[in-house]
Structures are given as structure tokens and as C-alpha cells.
């Protein structure tokens, strides 16, 4: 049957060469699930805690403590349970941890087990993962938000914003959307090289040129879109992840690249001007994670013109999301499985968002793996949007390739989300 008979955790490496947790789950009927846990560089203060060893190995970043929790306490607690009862399994691990932020056993330990259990249950029923999680109604292929220029803590340059994304809103399918993105990515590489900029890539596969402002980065992207024969705003839109918490201090936003300091009102005005000047349809973390006043002002100013996404603000946490909904802050939530630490809590956050009319965007982390779980999750939740990096690095492409496969599997039932921003 679908009874858990063994759980094996191990320490492996992520896309940055840092340790992460991998978990194998075996069921009584021979079914098997394996999951790898991602890790962020730009992390919100309110995220669940990933447990690191803090010793000399891997400069303190080892995860042997989290692995020991998987192979010890968690196995003892979950052995003999039914893998199909995801909520009960996740709740049992949360209770076992006993802390509000999963700090004792580690969110990385809990998440690895939670995702591997879901994969094993899907395998036992001979179902694709997206179908097992999402049921028969899972059929929407997400519009990809492709991060082709990296800045902030994701790159060694002076750009303060963390991500500049192209969004193929006018593509007829996810396969074609990925083609659009790849063509623009390579066109951008050529333009950067011709202009004398380095074309090395950052953590998420995007280029990391020594630009000093957001306008400069967007202008290069716009030129690359046009060079490929696509129409900005009609076929390709633009998205930003400001990651504003990273340059927010004492009530102001400090732009090292521009050498400017903006107060809350000036930050809002600056973002509003960018939306007016370019086909920007989504802005993530335009204000800092605890700048609720700024978030409210930003939402009131451009929330009807642009998707306002809370990442560090909401950290995939249903309670923080409910607070934001009550305050009228933001209109979308970024969903990162490791911010909360279990699959069932992740799905709950998506449900809370959808019930309130907020959009949800399934997202990777800067420290990724070859695990393509989030591609299936995006389809399972019918959320219509996914962030999984640029068109380089196999840890990013694993998700894009899985979306192509899922679209093929769904056949005539598949529907590409496309332009959901209007």
C-alpha cells in the first residue's frame, strides 16, 4: 500500500555549490519519491529557518544536522503513515519541530520530506505530479517570468534591483514562450558583447553587466526584444524584482549604482515613472518587507496598473498574507516552497491568495537544484505564472523543460496563461 517504510536524507550540493538536503521516500508498494531543497540568497526576515551546521565544514553551511533530523526523528514519526495524507504528514512534522519557524529541525529538513512524500504518493498512483497535487482541473501552463539581467545580491555589479524579467505574454503556448525567451536572451548577449560588457551570468542564469541604473538595463532589454522582431508590451512584457529590503535603511532607499537616496514617497514615484515609461506589468518587492506604509502607498498609486508582488513581504505565509489583504497591500504573492517549509502550507497560501482575488506566482530560489517540482506545482495550482530564472544553467532549464513535457502530456486540455495582466 502507500505506507511509508523508509525515509533517507543526505547532504548534496545546490547550484551555487552550497550544501542542501536531498530526501528519498520509499513506500510499502515499492513507490519512490525524491526531492531536493532550494535555498535563497535574498531571504526575508520572516521566512522559515533553514538549519545550517555552523561549523568548519563548507564554511558553516553544511546541513548534516538537518539530514540527521530526517534520518532520525522525522523517520521515527512518519514511518507507518499513509503518504497520501499530505496534510497529516506535514502537521505531524510541524508539531514534532515545535517552533513557530521550524528552527529546531529545520525547514530544509521538513520541506525535503514533504515534497518527497508527495512524489512518492504520485508514483504509487502512477500519476504525473501535477495531476496528483492539482487533480483533474490542473491544465493551465504558467506564463514564465524570465530573469535575463541579474543585479542586487544575485550578481557582482552595481545594479540595485535584483531581477529584470521578460514575460512572453503574446506567445501561443509555453513551448513557444520559452522559444521567445531564448531568442531574446541570445540577442541580449550579443548586444552586451558588442557594447563591451561582460556576458558572464549570475546565480539565476541572467547576465550581470556593470550597469548603474534600472533604466539602462531595461533599455538593453527593449532593444533586444525589438531586434528579435517581437513587439514590447504586446508580445513581450517586462517585470522587475526590486528586492528593496536589501537597500532599505532607516526609512530610505539607498541606490549605490545611481548614488541616490530616495524616501518612501520618492521610491513610489520612481517606480510609477518606470511603469509609465516601459511595458512593465509586474513589480516584486517594490518596497521593503516591513515598510507597510510604503507598500500601501505603492499599491494605491499603481496597483491598478501593475501587478504588485509581495515576496519578502508575505514569505509564502498565510498569516502575513491575510494581514496584507486586510490592509489592501499588494495584489499578488510570490510562492516559494522553502519560505514556509511544507507542501500543504504552500498550497494553503495559494488558496488564501486566490480566494481574496490576489494572484500567486510559483517561484524558484537563487540556490536551485535539478529538481523540477515547481514546474508541476505551477500547473497543479493553475496559478498562471512561474519564475524560474533565465535561459541558461541546467538548474533553471530543468523547470522549463518539464513545462514543455507537461504541455505535451496535457495535449488539447493544455491552456497557456499568456497575458493575464490586463
UniProtKB/Swiss-Prot annotation:
It is an enzyme of class 4 (lyase). Keywords: Cytoplasm, Glycolysis, Lyase, Magnesium, Metal-binding, Secreted. Pathway: Carbohydrate degradation; glycolysis; pyruvate from D-glyceraldehyde 3-phosphate: step 4/5. It catalyses: (2R)-2-phosphoglycerate = phosphoenolpyruvate + H2O. It is found in: Cytoplasm; Secreted; Cell surface. GO terms for molecular function: magnesium ion binding; phosphopyruvate hydratase activity. InterPro entries: Enolase (IPR000941), Enolase-like_C_sf (IPR036849), Enolase-like_N (IPR029017), Enolase_C (IPR020810), Enolase_CS (IPR020809), Enolase_N (IPR020811). GO terms for biological process: glycolytic process. Binds a second Mg(2+) ion via substrate during catalysis. (2R)-2-phosphoglycerate binds at residues 162, 336, 365-366, 387. Mg(2+) binds at residues 241, 284, 311. Its cofactor is Mg(2+). It comes from Bartonella tribocorum (strain CIP 105476 / IBS 506). The active site is at 204 (proton donor), 336 (proton acceptor). GO terms for cellular component: cell surface; extracellular region; phosphopyruvate hydratase complex. SUPFAM superfamilies: Enolase C-terminal domain-like, Enolase N-terminal domain-like. The lineage of its organism: Bacteria, Pseudomonadati, Pseudomonadota, Alphaproteobacteria, Hyphomicrobiales. This is Enolase. Pfam families: Enolase_C (PF00113), Enolase_N (PF03952). Belongs to the enolase family. The keyword Zinc-finger does not apply. Catalyzes the reversible conversion of 2-phosphoglycerate (2-PG) into phosphoenolpyruvate (PEP). It is essential for the degradation of carbohydrates via glycolysis. Its EC number is 4.2.1.11.
